[in-house]
From Swiss-Prot:
Family: Belongs to the aldehyde dehydrogenase family. AstD subfamily.
Name the UniProt record assigns to this protein: N-succinylglutamate 5-semialdehyde dehydrogenase
Species name: Caulobacter sp. (strain K31)
Active-site residues, record numbering mapped to chain: E244, C278
Pathway: Amino-acid degradation; L-arginine degradation via AST pathway; L-glutamate and succinate from L-arginine: step 4/5
InterPro entries per UniProt: Ald_DH/histidinol_DH, Ald_DH_C, Ald_DH_CS_CYS, Ald_DH_CS_GLU, Ald_DH_N, Aldehyde_DH_dom, SuccinylGlu_semiald_DH_AstD
Main function: Catalyzes the NAD-dependent reduction of succinylglutamate semialdehyde into succinylglutamate.
Gene3D superfamilies assigned: Aldehyde Dehydrogenase, Chain A, domain 1 (3.40.605.10), Aldehyde Dehydrogenase, Chain A, domain 2 (3.40.309.10)
């Protein structure tokens, strides 16, 4: 490999500015390459356009065979790939190994979803048959995030390739190495030249990509970026947009019993991945009584026990660093500006890099808090007087990605399920729960009604209805109002 770009089956050095990727745990530079120029972005899209007809014409079985080889490559490379992800993101090795498992598992889940949701179905008709088929859109641009730099773009790329689309992939500028390793695995699996292309860079490269004649944009990231893309493509109804955005996710605890058991679910909802999951709980809503206070105390106590440290340190951590020193500085500033009573302060962590922060807990009861996603381990607590107030507080957001209820009362769950506005709703499970066999997406500022995961098949192909008779028959008698 002689460069950080992969265009038309060839690795090449970029003509843009130099870029680096830094291990947030140590500050060490672990990747250094030149980014893509506008001309190279255009070349990547042209390569994908040129490769599209032949790839789309391949049989389903041929495309499946390539993707199953890709799965095998991922399995074989799990150890080295997971370590690279841990170095680039700071995430614990148990997390990055799980991420590799999800990437490999995506292949079979996508095959099943494609056949179930976008396969071919026929019905007999008096004249012959009516057939539903699905066709690939063409060239898909995939913009990846930093928090799951393998799994989340993989969740777009695999179903797109399976459907017959070709792809130009731009990873997050925070995690270029992860994107490179993903494309290397596809290359080893035998994906034909031009079917997958990789361009590296920041916002200017992303802008150059969406300015091209693409057929779809598959994006995972912030609500602000999603709003920008909607405006950008307002006059391009031909471009399929699949936007998986953030959340200001509520977790309601009501009549839940053991505070320690409840606290374990809350911590796994709010502080896993150092709060850098779009489905992390940001708002904890509890009863304003002794039971609610016991839950709050249990969360604060359990938070003190969480191991915060490097992925390759002496003790396995629950939390690693945030993605960068800059992200940590923004998180600390956001925590400081949060109104209310600080129950556990978010702070820097002594003896570790500036990217490490501790989990924070703030009681915001009675306060007006901006409806924003703070991508960090900071949990707001709000105490309310009734379960109906709890549901109202949970729904008091423009977002609608994930929500959860912790309760031993089935009646509460039934009520919560019918009233909550979210695309992922969990009962006595962390808000971060998801599965490749289910859709994943949200309402409001959290998406555009094109959920990913199992429903990714829907936005990777479009339906074609055909009405077919094998022979020409004389239908003259069917014409009404015909002169003799």
């Amino acid at each position: 490999m002689s460069g950080g770009l992969f265009i038309d089956g060839v690795w090449r050095a970029g003509a843009g500015a130099q870029a680096t990727s830094v291990d947030p745990t140590t500050g060490e530079v672990i990747w250094r390459q030149a980014t893509a120029s506008t001309a190279e972005v255009a070349a990547a899209v042209e390569a994908a356009r040129k490769a599209f007809p032949a790839w789309a014409d391949r049989s389903r079985e041929e495309r499946i065979a390539v993707l199953r080889r890709y799965k095998d490559v991922l399995v074989a490379r799990t150890g080295t790939f997971a370590e690279a992800l841990s170095r680039e993101t700071g995430k614990a090795l148990w997390e990055t190994k799980a991420e590799l498992g999800s990437m490999a598992g995506k292949v079979e889940a996508s095959i099943k979803a494609y056949d179930e949701r976008t396969g071919e179905h026929a019905n007999d008709m008096a004249f012959g048959r009516a057939v539903l088929r699905h066709r690939a859109h063409g060239v898909m641009a995939v913009l990846g995030p930093f928090n799951f730099p393998g799994h989340l773009p993989n969740g777009h790329i695999v179903p797109a390739l399976l459907a017959g689309d070709t792809v130009v992939f731009k990873p997050s500028e925070e995690t270029p190495l992860a994107g490179q390793l993903l494309v290397e695995a596809l290359e080893e699996a035998g994906v034909p030249a031009g079917v997958i292309n990789l361009v590296q860079g920041g916002r200017e490269v992303g802008q150059a990509l969406i300015d091209q004649e693409i057929d779809g944009l598959l994006f995972t990231g912030s609500a602000a970026a999603g709003a920008f893309f909607r405006r950008h493509f307002a006059d391009r109804p031909d471009v399929i947009l699949a936007l998986e955005l953030g959340g200001n996710n509520p977790l309601v605890v009501w009549d839940a019993g053991d505070p320690e058991a409840v606290a374990a679910l809350i911590v796994q909802s709010a502080f896993i991945t150092t709060g850098q999951r779009c489905s992390c709980a940001r708002r904890l809503i509890v009863s304003d009584d002794a039971a609610g206070r016991a839950v709050i105390d249990a969360v604060a106590a359990l938070s003190e026990r969480l191991v915060i440290g490097p992925w390759n340190g002496g003790q396995e951590p629950f939390m690693g660093p945030l993605i960068s020193d800059r992200a940590a500085a923004m998180a600390l500033a956001g925590a400081k500006a949060m109104p209310g009573q600080t129950l556990r302060a978010m702070t820097s962590v002594d003896g570790l890099s500036r990217a490490f922060v501790s989990p924070g807990l703030v009681d915001v009861t009675g306060e007006t808090v901006p409806d924003e996603e703070l991508f960090a381990p900071l949990l707001q607590v709000r105490r309310v007087g009734s379960f109906e107030e709890a549901i109202a507080a949970a729904n008091a957001t423009r977002y609608g990605l994930s929500a959860g209820l912790v309760s031993n009362e089935t009646a509460h769950w039934d009520r919560f399920l019918t009233r909550i506005r979210a695309g992922v709703v969990n009962w006595n499970r962390p808000t971060t729960g998801a599965a490749g066999t289910m859709p994943f997406g949200g309402l409001g500022n959290s998406g555009n009604h094109r959920p990913s995961a199992y429903y990714a098949a829907d936005y990777c192909a479009y339906p074609v209805a055909s009405f077919e008779a094998e022979n020409v028959t004389n239908t003259l008698g069917d014409i009404k109002g015909l002169r003799a």
